[in-house]
């Protein structure tokens, strides 16, 4: 601890991102990146934007991308908020909407950035336990709160909460903001964006990192009632008025316009996921039902941490979490058939 730090800094427990190895020969199945490239139209749009105009600031409102998102989801532009990745969007949400007297609620097994934001902004929170099957129970959230947030599909489990249950949670807390974090929704679920016109307390976040294959671009979004969006805009413009650069604006807009590439690559990921689930079950793994671009699996006869270490020795990286309830699980990102073959061969050698 430095004498120059503000007092609260020493108490922060930062988020630990998944490993980004420098060795390119490794089979990387640990950070849920899309194994297939982004839309060629998005790449071309970004190349076309590489002009002398880079000397100028980007559009602070990101109107091009905002209108593309609004058109895709059939909402109004003033219902859309954009940020430098969904993590920044979530950070603004915690800052703008969750600082109240009652606790924020989120699952005990979910995105590990949530308690980090609470620590950063001094937000009181309670973690709500998943059931024995690692599912969210909507009725558990019908209690006093100052807000609710949960990933759907959940991360790192991959389990999906049906839209009826999502709506049940929203209805039970009409005076609190309910945030549905849909980073992985395109791989097997139905978006709650269809509900935002019905519920002024609903905010839905998404990212272009997963199903749009643009993790390196850092584009996140939120869709909700204009009152909620205005709060986020106020925080954003008190922090960074230019979160999205010129490449992100044009590339993101083009990605939303290229529906054919999106559908093709998404379906390939889903097909690969289902095939890998069956292959792992054939090797004795228990695999949770997944609606994401990853699976959550455990082997009853092998320690998960040891498995992850042995796979790494063979050039395959998967994600292991030390949290008690899930310490015997591995999260495995969906890759190409060739990457899956390397994983399966590595497991056969263990």
From Swiss-Prot:
- Quickly give the catalysed reaction: L-histidinol phosphate + 2-oxoglutarate = 3-(imidazol-4-yl)-2-oxopropyl phosphate + L-glutamate
Pathway recorded for this protein: Amino-acid biosynthesis; L-histidine biosynthesis; L-histidine from 5-phospho-alpha-D-ribose 1-diphosphate: step 7/9
Which InterPro entries does this chain map to? Aminotrans_II_pyridoxalP_BS, Aminotransferase_I/II_large, HisP_aminotrans, PyrdxlP-dep_Trfase, PyrdxlP-dep_Trfase_major, PyrdxlP-dep_Trfase_small
Provide the E.C. number(s) assigned to this enzyme.
2.6.1.9
The cofactor named in the record is: pyridoxal 5'-phosphate
Q: Which residues in this protein are found as N6-(pyridoxal phosphate)lysine? A: 210
Reply yes or no: does the keyword Amino-acid biosynthesis apply: yes
Q: Which top EC class applies here?
A: transferase
Q: Which UniProt keywords apply?
A: Amino-acid biosynthesis, Aminotransferase, Histidine biosynthesis, Pyridoxal phosphate, Transferase
Q: Which NCBIfam families match?
A: hisC
This chain belongs to the protein called Histidinol-phosphate aminotransferase
